[in-house]
């Protein structure tokens, strides 16, 4: 065993597991294309103030969970990204993309970092996939990102998910509610935990997001934001619900749902999985019209988005048995050299097959035919192509189907044609 171990809160992903990641990623890519979203990639680190301005200084993420550092004593603080939305919006504003096209639909699959206590489904380095729809203020926009997210989960075959939605209104609604909430919480001030006391003045809505069991009785008794909403905000929320109903997307309304980021407005949503225990959120998102202005834009930019935790998706799928038939794909052909002296010819044949788009493996260690065949079976190769002295002279090679045991001798050109036909039949089945 190596004296060096993986850093706590990070993990290695080996080939037998990476096939599961690719499966989920392929579904995300395919559906993103169907919905008209293009991929964006941003740096893994940003200036720290980007997240302080966007996520909010009273959030747990900014207050406790960011990996920040100074690249040099006179430099600005830099942070490994704890979430994607702020970086995506920064990139769009910096590139001035909204001046060239008023609507942008972007998606990502990215690595993120938070200083959390490692546990199942919650690591210090973790992955998310998500989407951002920028430039559309219609309730149809947030309904689309919810639909996109739920269709990913449906396509993956995940069962038993619960979608909760709420409306946070606009800035005036929340300002009005903050005063009502402070008035309610004031008599309980001495019972608030330290984090909630810090939030009491700055942003009491964050108190509603507390997971402290000792705080739940106080939170349950709090007035809801719903009672402070304007007619326009309620009407906006009703339209979102209409779009979800028309698509038969089931949901529950949860007036306590505020999400963990300060930039949300109007509709917010969260999806939970019964397979994940206490940390049951598998995805979520909402609308964030004011984020662009917080980051220096001259005005608001209507925007909606979602993010889902890749590790939590994989845990849920594993527990529901959705990977039972999923295995790493082996090579289509294993080229077997009957003696080490024929390795050069075997490599030439393998090169020819690969040039034709046929996945091919060849033994480089000069092992016996028996060892090579064991290797071919271990790799789940579909065919073995044998290279012997007679084959080199005649140009006719023995090709064995390792599933049916059928064997034929053909020229390399005919073998390539047969293998390509086999590939087409495989894809059509």
Curated annotation (Swiss-Prot):
It catalyses: tRNA(His) + L-histidine + ATP = L-histidyl-tRNA(His) + AMP + diphosphate + H(+). This is Histidine--tRNA ligase. Signal peptide: none annotated. Keywords: Aminoacyl-tRNA synthetase, ATP-binding, Cytoplasm, Ligase, Nucleotide-binding, Protein biosynthesis. The keyword Mitochondrion does not apply. It comes from the Bacteria. InterPro entries: aa-tRNA-synth_II, aa-tRNA-synth_II/BPL/LPL, Anticodon-bd, Anticodon-bd_dom_sf, His-tRNA-ligase, HisRS-like_core, HisRS/HisZ, HisRS_anticodon. One of its GO terms (molecular function) is ATP binding. Belongs to the class-II aminoacyl-tRNA synthetase family. Homodimer. It is found in: Cytoplasm. GO terms for biological process: histidyl-tRNA aminoacylation. Its EC number is 6.1.1.21. The keyword Nucleotide-binding applies. Pfam families: HGTP_anticodon, tRNA-synt_His. It is an enzyme of class 6 (ligase). One of its GO terms (cellular component) is cytoplasm.
